[in-house]
A protein has these predicted regions:
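Membrane-embedded alpha-helical bundles of multi-pass transporters/translocases
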Residues: 1-172
Length: 172
């Protein structure tokens, strides 16, 4: 596989890995401590959103396989999912001071549905790029390495922002 195609496919893995640290590590603190929901309630709300996510994963997989678009049949799902997830993460990381349980739950579900709409077709697309087993392994390995670089970059950005004196909520 040409490096240009491999780079085009693996590039989004970097961008989609960037929000993982803010969402998984700082989101509970943001809502549980800074917005006074309490860590237990915040954890329960996020668990409920994840349980709903377990239902949407196979549904989105089925729909993205069944309703294929002509050329690049997975790209509309990927683009729509990225937009929905982007809106969800923006709302989650920029809550109103009076944001409560319903706000956290609804925007968490929005994020996870968007993420599923992005991730399931994106991962399936990688498997469709080659019929050769070893080439698919190479494609997946490159994608996951780029994803890890995105996670490390997110951690470095937040650490750098904190080092420069920004508070934790401003860092995320």
């Amino acid at each position: 596989m040409r490096i240009r195609i491999l780079s085009s496919y693996t590039g989004p893995a970097f961008a989609t890995a960037l929000p993982t640290i803010p969402v998984y590590i700082y989101l509970p603190t943001l809502y549980g401590v800074h917005l006074d929901l309490g860590l237990t309630i915040t954890g329960i709300v996020l668990l409920i959103a994840r349980l709903i996510d377990t239902l949407t994963d196979p549904l989105i997989g089925l729909l993205s396989d069944k309703f294929a678009f002509r050329n690049n049949h997975r790209k509309p799902w990927i683009i729509a999912g990225a937009l929905i997830a982007g809106i969800g993460i923006h709302q989650l990381l920029n809550p109103n001071p009076d944001a409560g349980i319903v706000y956290l739950l609804s925007w968490s579900i929005t994020l996870y549905v968007g993420w599923t709409m992005f991730a399931v077709p994106y991962l399936a697309w990688g498997a469709e790029l080659s019929s050769d087993y070893h080439e698919r392994t190479r494609i997946t390995s490159y994608r996951e390495c780029i994803s890890i670089l995105g996670i490390l970059a997110a951690g470095a950005l937040i650490a750098g922002a904190t080092f420069m004196g920004w508070s934790e909520p401003k860092s995320i």
